[in-house]
């Protein structure tokens, strides 16, 4: 399919990196990292409690959700967040190094194909150090012109999607117009970020239930990353 795009922006986790790991539950490595952070303060929570008390507020409220969690347990939010980030970054890098986190099937081939037609960029809600490591570890750096993850300080949670902060930064750095860009993401919140940036989008997977939460329809739908060649 012929397109007029000049840059394809790729989300990382769930798009070309399978971050679920090898545990019995998805992202078990991340739960274990969080439990390690809690253990430092003498706190023990189940996975269900972590989901309810921390992850759900983190996703919906960002930094305010983290502060509310810390208030619940009498923790200093800046100190706790710094420890949490350190532990989860170390765990994610180790999971990639040891083979627990791998590329999604077909990712390298389609990334190589796309890099021959477009500029490629990464815009991820994962930490910058994890994005750097993933591209280096999986030998993907040569294919990408630019890549962004978020900073690890608490206030940087505000730059996560649906905020188009890093999409806009890529367009600025490459001196491209909005009509020149398309974002590929596996989450509807990413599609909303693309809408907020005024660019086209591709949604990987058909999670209708999650899509209902967000006001944004993708330009294209594909089942997996290998199908990108059909629309780009």
Residue positions per predicted region:
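An amphipathic alpha-helix signature
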Residues: 27-35, 39, 62-67, 128, ...
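Generic enzyme active-site microenvironment
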Residues: 9-11, 123, 183-184
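Active-site neighborhood of HAD-like aspartate-dependent phosphohydrolases
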Residues: 1-51
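Asp-based, Mg2+/Mn2+-dependent phosphohydrolase catalytic module
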Residues: 1-5, 128, 132-232
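A metal-dependent, Asp-based hydrolase signature
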Residues: 40-46, 54-95
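Short, acidic loop-to-helix structural element flanking the phosphoryl-transfer center
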Residues: 90-122, 128-132, 164
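Alpha-helical elements of Rossmann-like donor-binding domains used by nucleotide-donor carbohydrate transfer enzymes
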Residues: 29-36, 68, 109, 113, ...
């Amino acid at each position: 399919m012929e397109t007029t795009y000049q840059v394809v922006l790729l989300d990382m986790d769930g798009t070309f990196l399978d971050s679920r790991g090898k545990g019995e539950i998805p992202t078990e490595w991340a739960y274990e990292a969080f439990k390690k952070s809690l253990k430092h303060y003498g706190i023990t929570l189940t996975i269900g409690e972590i989901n309810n008390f921390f992850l759900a507020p983190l996703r919906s409220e960002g930094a305010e959700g983290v502060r509310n969690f810390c208030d619940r347990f009498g923790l200093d939010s800046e100190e706790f967040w710094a420890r949490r980030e350190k532990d989860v970054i170390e765990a994610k890098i180790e999971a990639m190094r040891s083979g627990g986190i791998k590329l999604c099937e077909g990712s390298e081939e389609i990334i190589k194909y796309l890099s021959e037609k477009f500029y490629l960029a990464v815009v991820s809600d994962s930490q910058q150090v994890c994005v750097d490591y993933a591209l280096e570890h999986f030998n993907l750096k040569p294919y990408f012109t630019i890549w962004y993850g978020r900073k690890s300080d608490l206030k940087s949670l505000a730059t996560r999607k649906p905020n188009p902060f890093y999409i806009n930064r890529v367009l600025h750095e490459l001196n491209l117009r909005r009509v020149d860009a398309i974002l590929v993401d596996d989450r509807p919140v990413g599609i909303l970020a693309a809408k907020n940036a005024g660019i086209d989008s591709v949604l990987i997977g058909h999670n209708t239930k999650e899509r209902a939460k967000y006001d944004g329809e993708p330009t294209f739908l594909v089942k997996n990353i290998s199908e990108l060649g059909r629309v780009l």
